[in-house]
Amino acid sequence: MTKLTLYPGTFDPITNGHLDLIKRSAAMFEHIIVAVAASPSKNTLFTLDERVQLVQEVTQDLPNVSVEGFSGLMVDFARQKQANLLVRGLRTTMDFEYEFGLTSMYRKLMPELESVFLTPSEEYAFLSSTIVREVALHGGSVEAFVPSVVNQALIHKVKSPV
């Protein structure tokens, strides 16, 4: 059975860790939709459209990866796309506990949606969008942690916040 796979997240911004997970997933699964969540409850630095555009730019060389923004419940988006597999990254035991709770809820809301968890490559185990944003907002360099187009977008956003 062909699996349509979702990799959901806020991606504010997308990091090298996210990109590593996308590339590894693209090598394992037929098609990946990177599902960029609107996340209205989060105070995002980039708009949904900006985040979708950045993810599209950094994944354009991956032919079996597409990028879409969505709002509302992730399971509703998965159902709309007829996805039956969800990829999530796990860095820490805190991530595991959070994801375990989400997976339990997803099973109740959409039993046919399976979850696959990937651990990060060692060099990205500490990396998060929150840390990247904080460092950038305080004037630190994040070029080692994000693709260059994202680094430039962060520099621009921090210098002229909207």
Swiss-Prot record:
Where on this chain does substrate bind? Answer: T10, K42, M74, R88
Q: Which GO terms describe its molecular function?
A: ATP binding; pantetheine-phosphate adenylyltransferase activity
Where is this protein found? Cytoplasm
Which pathway does the database say it acts in?
Cofactor biosynthesis; coenzyme A biosynthesis; CoA from (R)-pantothenate: step 4/5
Q: Does the keyword Glycoprotein apply?
A: no
Name the residues annotated as site: Transition state stabilizer.
H18
Spell out the Pfam families in the cross-references: CTP_transf_like
EC number from the UniProt entry: 2.7.7.3
Q: Keywords for this entry? A: ATP-binding, Coenzyme A biosynthesis, Cytoplasm, Magnesium, Nucleotide-binding, Nucleotidyltransferase, Transferase
- Supply the enzyme class, top level: transferase
The organism's superkingdom is given as Bacteria
InterPro entries per the record? Cyt_trans-like (IPR004821), PPAT (IPR001980), Rossmann-like_a/b/a_fold (IPR014729)
Is Cytoplasm found in the keyword set?
yes
Q: Which GO terms describe its biological process?
A: coenzyme A biosynthetic process
Q: Where does ATP bind?
A: T10, F11, H18, G89, L90, R91, E99, Y124, A125, F126, L127, S128, S129, T130
One GO CC annotation: cytoplasm
Required co-factor(s) are: Mg(2+)
The catalytic activity, as recorded, is:
(R)-4'-phosphopantetheine + ATP + H(+) = 3'-dephospho-CoA + diphosphate
Role of this protein: Reversibly transfers an adenylyl group from ATP to 4'-phosphopantetheine, yielding dephospho-CoA (dPCoA) and pyrophosphate.
Give the family this protein belongs to, as stated in its UniProt record.
Belongs to the bacterial CoaD family.
* Subunit organization: Homohexamer.
Q: Which HAMAP family match?
A: PPAT_bact
NCBIfam families to which the protein is assigned, alphabetical: coaD_prev_kdtB, cyt_tran_rel
The protein, known as: Phosphopantetheine adenylyltransferase
Q: In which organism is this protein found?
A: Aliivibrio salmonicida (strain LFI1238) (Vibrio salmonicida (strain LFI1238))
Lineage of origin: Bacteria, Pseudomonadati, Pseudomonadota, Gammaproteobacteria, Vibrionales
